[in-house]
Amino acid sequence: RKSLYQEFHGSTIPDVGIGYLYVDSSSEMMSNDDPSWKTLGTSVQLPKASQLLITDANLTPRSDNLDSYPGLKQWLGSPDAWRDILNSIVGATLGGQKRRLGRFLFACKAGNYREQVQTQVKLLQQSGETDVTFHPVLGLAGGTGSGSVIDAVAQLRDLYPDSPRLRILV
């Protein structure tokens, strides 16, 4: 997004058929005044419709009642182990460097993710072009991105099974 803005020297960016969905377990880079989104003196921050914060997911009640969440139960593991993990979390930024915690957070917000992806695809397809290529871009340093990449791709493919027209490139 910053590169496009820089390439067009701050002018109106032509309709290039790009949609964004920024998913994170930290709200740090989601505020309108976040300096990392500034280029050429202008904020190119994504609108709220292109952001998904995956915190505040009531993880403890979910881990204590896994029978009600069969999709989580398959891979989450022991509720006792999760109680220890969840009790050790400090502050509101829940993801940190824990891959399974990233998966857990993402799983709790998968419905929101699906809705926001569908909104982005509809906006892109309004031009009449129905083919879409998804490019999940994420951090693999051991935090929530590396924990949820497979789940994000699986949700995309579940939503859009027509792989020749709706490609996913990771």
What feature does the model see in each segment?
Residues 1-137, 147-170:
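Segments that form or flank anion-binding pockets
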